[in-house]
Amino acid sequence: MITLTKVLSKELARSNIRVNAIAPGVVDTEMGKSIPEENRKVMLTHVPLGRFGEPSEIANVVLFLCSPLASYVTGQTVHVNGGWWG
């Protein structure tokens, strides 16, 4: 996905079309909550912010990337994961 984002951004920039990707971490949705509690605890040890994301936090990044504020942003993958490492 990262390479596709970069390639498409180069091809479509001539047409003033921006292409970006969002790489979310674990988000507190029904899918995220279906992860067994023991696994969730281990996963949280890799998140410096100490919690999983909220759907609205991912949506806010989408809104930013679609707005004029991101008019010079293309070919990027934005990691929205609370600083996840590991």
Regions found by a protein language model. Name each.
Residues 33-47:
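A short C-terminal helix-loop "cap" of Rossmann-like NAD(P)-dependent dehydrogenase/epimerase domains
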Residues 47-58, 69:
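A conserved structural motif in NAD(P)-dependent oxidoreductases
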Residues 16, 21, 77-79:
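Conserved beta-strand scaffold in the Rossmann-like NAD(H)/NADP(H)-binding core
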Residues 5, 59-62, 66:
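Short-chain dehydrogenase/reductase
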Residues 10, 19, 23-33:
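Short, flexible catalytic-loop segment of classical short-chain dehydrogenase/reductase
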Residues 10-14, 71:
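Alpha-helical segment proximal to the catalytic Tyr-Lys
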Residues 1-11:
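Conserved catalytic helix of short-chain dehydrogenase/reductases
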